[in-house]
């Protein structure tokens, strides 16, 4: 009789171990991490030269984006 009780306990432990092993691991949310900010050095290095394509003034080395190109002067002929 004690063999059946021991067998039942072992089967239950085995089933619980399989359930724990098969459970998904919780993933760390990427929203909790702060994105790294660019240092002033890398911000300056990443700026685009005169004549490169741009979307706004902040992308150009001269801070002048005219007609989607980094410009040297404000007035365009």
Swiss-Prot record:
Coiled coil: none annotated. GO terms for cellular component: extracellular region. The keyword Mitochondrion does not apply. Has an antimicrobial activity. This is Liver-expressed antimicrobial peptide 2. PANTHER family: LIVER EXPRESSED ANTIMICROBIAL PEPTIDE 2, LIVER-EXPRESSED ANTIMICROBIAL PEPTIDE 2. GO terms for biological process: defense response to bacterium. Residues 1-22 form the signal peptide. It is found in: Secreted. It comes from the Eukaryota. Disulfide bonds join 54-65, 60-70. Its main location: secreted. Keywords: Antibiotic, Antimicrobial, Cleavage on pair of basic residues, Disulfide bond, Secreted, Signal. Belongs to the LEAP2 family. Residues 23-37 form a propeptide. Pfam families: LEAP-2.
């Amino acid at each position: 009789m004690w063999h059946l009780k021991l067998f039942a306990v072992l089967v239950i432990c085995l089933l619980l171990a399989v359930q724990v092993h098969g459970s998904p691991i919780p993933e760390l949310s990427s929203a909790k991490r702060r994105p790294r900010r660019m240092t002033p050095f890398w911000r300056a290095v990443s700026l685009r030269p005169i004549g490169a394509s741009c979307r706004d003034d902040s992308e150009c080395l001269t801070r002048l984006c005219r007609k989607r190109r980094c410009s040297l002067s404000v007035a365009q002929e």
